[in-house]
Amino acid sequence: MDSASQDINLNSPNKGVLSDFMTDVPVDPGVVHRTPVVEGLTEGEEEELRAELAKVEEEIVTLRQVLAAKERHCGELKRRLGLSTLGELKQNLSRSWHDVQVSTAYVKTSEKLGEWNEKVTQSDLYKKTQETLSQAGQKTSAALSTMGSAISRKLGDMSSYSIRHSISMPVMRNSATFKSFEDRVGTIKSKVVGGRENGSDNLPPSPGSGDQTLPDHAPF
């Protein structure tokens, strides 16, 4: 029996032979850390792609560093020119909105919405609904106009009556007819009052009064 197939019994005197043999075997680091070849690619193609990936990642890092330097320089220029952050924000928003408007998705969405709007406005249901709403609006406007005219006319009549009444009272009192009527009423009143004051002298004596005098002491 060779050393590779020895008994691994812990009580065996040869228990350390296998481990010592495995420790002495050299191991290739490239074989251990190497990933399997991607399906559909040869080993040469994989190496080429990995080299290109490393190059692109290095370029990205360089571009980020350049971009950071450019942004710092841009901020310094804006600070020296006195440009505010609010103005920069407005400019960025305007630029972003312009980019959205010229984007393919926005253009397609606008065209689609335009087509839907045209289809809806040309449909019979939309036309009937629009006519119904238009008629209802006209009737409502006419009713409000009629009510407003009636209220205005009523207020005008009340105002005219009040003005005529306030104007006609002094004129009526100063008219000759009204004065003549007042004179007649005053004459009748004076006659009635004067007759009451002189009533005892003008009244005729009662029959049987004559010269008869009442006795001083009437018998009981």
From Swiss-Prot:
The modification Phosphothreonine is found at T177, T187. The modification Phosphoserine is found at S3, S12, S19, S96, S149, S168, S175, S180, S206, S209. Keywords: Acetylation, Coiled coil, Phosphoprotein. Residues 189-220 are annotated as: Disordered. InterPro entries: TPD52. The modification N-acetylmethionine is found at M1. Residues 40-82 form a coiled coil. The keyword Coiled coil applies. It comes from the Eukaryota. GO terms for cellular component: cytoplasm; perinuclear region of cytoplasm. Forms a homodimer or heterodimer with other members of the family. Interacts with MAL2. Belongs to the TPD52 family. This is Tumor protein D54. It comes from Mus musculus (Mouse). The lineage of its organism: Eukaryota, Metazoa, Chordata, Craniata, Vertebrata.
